[in-house]
Amino acid sequence: MAAKEKQIFFCKECGYESAKWQGQCPGCRAWNTFVEEKVKVGVKGAVKQPKDAVSPMGILQVTTAEESRVQTGMRELDRVLGGGIVKGSLVLVGGDPGIGKSTILLQMCRNLVHQNVNVLYVSGEESLSQIKMRAERIGVFEKDMLLLCDNDMDNIERVITKSNASVVIIDSIQTMVVEEVGSAPGTVTQVREVTARLMQVAKQYGIAIFIVGHVTKEGNVAGPRTLEHMVDSVLYFEGDRNHGFRILRGVKNRFGSTNEIGVFTMTEKGLEEVDNPSQALLNGRPQNVSGSVVVSSLEGTRPILVELQALVCQTNFNMPRRTSVGIDYNRVNLILAVMEKRVGMNLWGYDAYVNIAGGMKVNDTAVDLGVAFAIASSMNNKVVPSDTMIIGEIGLAGEIRGVTNVLQRAKEADKMGFATCIIPKSNYDKAMDKLNVKILCVSTLVEALSLL
């Protein structure tokens, strides 16, 4: 007798279930997130309870073997993962279409096969011949790498357990199907149940599973928010498709820090690691041009020097235009307001454009002072010396507030050959005197801009 179907509404954000449509989700309070799905009555979930009885174990009895991490052969990826792949982990890799998610995982598979690690690549989007063509294009010619083209979770689970694979790639989670659920691939129910099945396989057999997830136009992984809660690690692949740089950022990691990023560059032969991001981002920077400054952004534990550009010109509109690329728009408006109120600069009749060169996105407030310098430099047509790096957060009272890891940032500037660093006075450290960099300390925005 066939199972009956019924209509259920699910919240796309948190997976909350309701018998009727609601404008606001009672679970996560998000608006207009309910979608209608057909589910079979009686199917409570795809995850089966283990048959064997289990008993609790004391924490001191649990052993963590040194070999529990497997190196991927990519230093930048290992950095984000916390030192390598943990056996039995479930890792979600998200990013925009064409950003390089499948490419980095294929290159990782190649390196793992070289270490005699059994790898299985499962694709629900491409045929085996298409996967092979893409692999050959980026130089992956590994005869021992197993490929599977299927989207049925029952078949995939059977193959995983029989293949003796230690690492499995699922590309992508939105194409996989649990037949018992009875809804279309990519729906909230399917994504949740497929993830639950994969999590059970990973934990039961000690297999590391990487899941590729597509993102929505808002930049979130498509599917319920519970997907990110279920997995062990969430990695986001960021970057501008018009630029070669790619940033792999960890937003969740149960086995390591989330304060790390990996920097790559996209080439014709795939992704290449960037050992010195500061040098790569500053390469080709124009010299002796107003509105251009170098700032230090702390990405995880790694200081990265980037070029910040500003262009200020008279407006032809009643309301001046404010545009920012790679930096928070509201932050730029805040800095402009402080410059008008505390410094006395008349910026109302001028358009202001701020850009982070190289396609980078910066969220560090330590670049505030650099934004102010770039705007003042362009406004007054005065050049900031190309061998000067600027660090500091701007408060609403016009004070320059201290930021974190200034000594580490100054060391990076010294390594890159900079002659001067402008820093907050509260961040001065005697250890900076040993560097080959002149340290200029400032406490207010007026004092800082007087150096221009």
What are these regions (language model features)?
Residues V119-S123:
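Conserved RecA-like ASCE P-loop NTPase motor core of nucleic-acid helicases/translocases
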Residues A3-K6, F10-E13, E17-R79, V86-G94, ...:
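Peripheral, non-AAA+ core regions of ATP-driven protein-machinery
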Residues G124-Q130:
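Conserved Walker A/P-loop ATP-binding site and its immediately adjacent core
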